């Protein structure tokens, strides 16, 4: 988790602790800390470590309730971090 924190900080974001319930970090837009609420909620994980679909849906719904964008930060086996924006998909 620290490496993800450090990567976000190096990109110029303001990073604060998560709210609990599975979210690791709150991330504020560059230069906007204190002016607006966090735009992103970061859920961090390692490549190959499974997460249940139920847990992912629960965190996604909570982020939607808070009007935040959920981002999955995955650290791969080489130590690189890849970010995925998560949103709900409805099939009809």
Each language-model region and where it sits:
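A short catalytic or substrate-binding loop motif that flags glycine-/basic-rich loops and adjacent residues
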Residues: 17-21, 64
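Helix-rich interaction surfaces within compact, conserved domain-sized segments
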Residues: 43-92
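Short, well-ordered coil/turn elements that cap or connect secondary structure elements
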Residues: 10, 37, 65-67
